[in-house]
């Protein structure tokens, strides 16, 4: 089995995340994309939408995708979880022949600061989803995504056109309340 892990806060999930998943399924030789929402990103101090709410939104959004799995491992941990922990868990669970880890290009400047980065880089092949304003070095496999959407911006100004229709109204109500 070959899998790609796509971790993130998804606070909120948006059409850019869907575009990344679709491109990964099209361009990578994989059986599944496993989406792993964080409980709390180790580089952040808080979240707005609760982990269980973000998990529920992701399950609704990706229900029609038979090659996408939503993994609640980090949410169940109830604490910030390092990528290396999740990778080791998923390696034990699936024993993949190939393991990709999808990140946004905005993560590249701090990737070397990830917990046990050297070990992690030997266990996975990083795949970088492009984002406006960030260059991707040639050493990385790249997924071109032409969505200029920011979860940070959507928390402040939720806009329906950037949100998955199945959860758009719910997300807008949540962030406007």
Swiss-Prot record:
Pathway: Cofactor biosynthesis; NAD(+) biosynthesis; deamido-NAD(+) from nicotinate D-ribonucleotide: step 1/1. It holds the Pfam family CTP_transf_like. It catalyses: nicotinate beta-D-ribonucleotide + ATP + H(+) = deamido-NAD(+) + diphosphate. GO terms for molecular function: ATP binding; nicotinate-nucleotide adenylyltransferase activity. Keywords: ATP-binding, NAD, Nucleotide-binding, Nucleotidyltransferase, Pyridine nucleotide biosynthesis, Transferase. Its EC number is 2.7.7.18. It is an enzyme of class 2 (transferase). One of its GO terms (biological process) is NAD biosynthetic process. Catalyzes the reversible adenylation of nicotinate mononucleotide (NaMN) to nicotinic acid adenine dinucleotide (NaAD). Belongs to the NadD family. NCBIfam families: cyt_tran_rel, nicotinate (nicotinamide) nucleotide adenylyltransferase. This is Probable nicotinate-nucleotide adenylyltransferase.
